[in-house]
């Protein structure tokens, strides 16, 4: 018998998992157990360890230290916009709207990922705006999260979990229907993020978070209650135990 473990990376029962017969299923949260059981996965096999993230997301650098490393200005509010590896829809329009509404000295960091086309468009659009920082592909996402005050991201399971573990206030943009919809609903129901499908409202929600310390702290407190930074280590320990028993 070769041990087999599945790791869920969305906050819902992964489609077709009930048709598998593995040793264990690592799921993002204990509140999802009833959904998995209803779909036919045995409760004894469900381990709510959380979604694993790289260890650098489990360590927090001070805002000042992170900004110094990234050569970002110190004493200004700062938004982080994650495009996703392929870019979330209408990013150029969103960035223009956010920049237009940032009238109190806020800075915006936009990480374009692998989307070279959107990176070119944004660099051209904001060439003369020194408060908008366009970043292409980077291995320093954790550092940028440390440096910024609020993050905009689509509700993918991994980036949402990285943001949750990092304890940075989240504004979720419109989901791709399916698992991302479930992720958004899970986060919103527990006050781990705010969201809107409307671009102008997304901007407004981020502005409210960055301007209101109390709102930001309420979300941060909810995130501290729900995050599971030890997920990766627990999964590794589980795999080591399973292999050693073979």
Predicted feature descriptions by range:
Residues 188-214:
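C-terminal "capping" alpha-helix adjacent to the active site of nucleotide-linked donor transferases
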Residues 23-85, 114-117:
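A nucleotide-sugar donor-handling region in carbohydrate enzymes
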Residues 148-149, 167-169:
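A short alpha->beta transition loop at the rim of the catalytic pocket in nucleotide-sugar-dependent
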Residues 142, 160-166, 185:
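Short alpha-helical segment that forms part of, or immediately flanks, the ligand-binding pocket
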Residues 63-65, 72-148, 181:
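Donor-nucleotide binding loops and adjacent catalytic segments primarily
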Residues 228-246:
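C-terminal alpha-helical cap of glycosyltransferases
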Residues 146-156:
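Acidic donor-binding loop of glycosyltransferase active sites
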Residues 215-229:
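A short, well-ordered alpha-helix in the C-terminal region of glycosyltransferases
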């Amino acid at each position: 018998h070769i041990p087999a473990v599945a790791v869920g990376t969305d906050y819902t029962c992964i489609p077709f998992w009930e048709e598998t017969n593995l040793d264990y299923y690592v799921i993002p949260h204990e509140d999802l157990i009833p959904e998995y059981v209803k779909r036919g996965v045995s409760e004894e096999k469900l381990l709510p360890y959380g979604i694993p993230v790289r260890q650098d997301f489990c360590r927090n650098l001070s805002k000042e230290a992170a900004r110094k490393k990234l050569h970002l200005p110190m004493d200004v509010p700062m938004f982080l916009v994650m495009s996703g590896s392929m870019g979330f829809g209408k990013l150029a329009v969103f960035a223009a709207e956010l920049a237009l509404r940032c009238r109190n000295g806020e800075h915006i960091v936009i990480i374009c990922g692998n989307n070279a086309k959107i990176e070119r468009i944004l660099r051209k659009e904001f060439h003369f705006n020194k408060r908008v920082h366009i970043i292409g592909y980077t291995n320093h996402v954790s550092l940028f999260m440390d440096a910024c005050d609020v993050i905009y991201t689509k509700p993918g399971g991994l980036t949402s979990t990285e943001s949750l573990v990092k304890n940075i206030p989240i504004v979720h943009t419109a989901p791709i229907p399916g698992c991302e919809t479930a992720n958004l609903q899970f986060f919103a129901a527990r006050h781990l993020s705010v969201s809107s499908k409307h671009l102008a409202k997304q901007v407004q929600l981020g502005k409210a978070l960055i301007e209101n310390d109390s709102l930001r702290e309420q979300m941060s407190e909810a995130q501290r209650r729900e995050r599971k930074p030890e997920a990766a280590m627990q999964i590794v320990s589980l795999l080591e135990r399973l292999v050693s028993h073979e």
